[in-house]
Amino acid sequence: MEVLIVNESKHAAPRKFIQTWMQLVVTELKRKKVLKAEQARRELTLVFLDKKPAQKINMEFRGKNYATDVLSFDSMDPGSLGELVLCPEVLKRQSKEHGLTYQQELGYMLLHGVLHLLGYDHETSEAEALEMFGIQDAAFEVLLKKVSAK
């Protein structure tokens, strides 16, 4: 999967971590048969925004007037898996709340966003939420071990 990073925030995007993490995500989701080989060949765009623009997009597309950690947008381009919009300020705050490093929180939300792009939705039903978070948490545990081993 080719990952394009567009950083429009005042925070540096950890590009090397993102590239390594996303390679591991692809491998793990293919292993779990959640990601098809054809989907793994698509491009993924990551956009990093500061709080105000992230809040504006969240309001426009979800009707929620606050900046959120990650938003996912499907693509009409058959060569693209979609786009994830992330807010580093929210991720940094959440990492402290969750007892994770910033990169771990970013990794968790990248995984979360990719699952949304693959059709998983935790807001539709409790059963779907359990399925999505089950996949996400199990994959995250495996991925953390692989990243710390590198």
From Swiss-Prot:
Entries under Gene3D superfamilies matching the protein: Metalloproteases ('zincins'), catalytic domain
Localisation per UniProt entry: Cytoplasm
Gene Ontology CC: one annotated term: cytoplasm
InterPro entries membership: MetalPrtase_cat_dom_sf_prd (IPR023091), YbeY (IPR002036), YbeY_CS (IPR020549)
Entry annotated with the keyword Cell inner membrane: no
EC number: 3.1.-.-
A molecular function GO annotation: metalloendopeptidase activity
Comment on bound cofactor: Binds 1 zinc ion.
Entry keywords, A to Z: Cytoplasm, Endonuclease, Hydrolase, Metal-binding, Nuclease, Ribosome biogenesis, rRNA processing, Zinc
Superkingdom of the organism of origin: Bacteria
Alphabetical GO biological process terms: rRNA processing
Keyword field contains Endoplasmic reticulum: no
Binding-site positions, Zn(2+): 112, 116, 122
Pfam families: YbeY
Cofactor(s) essential for the protein: Zn(2+)
Protein purpose: Single strand-specific metallo-endoribonuclease involved in late-stage 70S ribosome quality control and in maturation of the 3' terminus of the 16S rRNA.
Family, as annotated: Belongs to the endoribonuclease YbeY family.
Name of this chain's protein: Endoribonuclease YbeY
The organism of origin for this protein: Bdellovibrio bacteriovorus (strain ATCC 15356 / DSM 50701 / NCIMB 9529 / HD100)
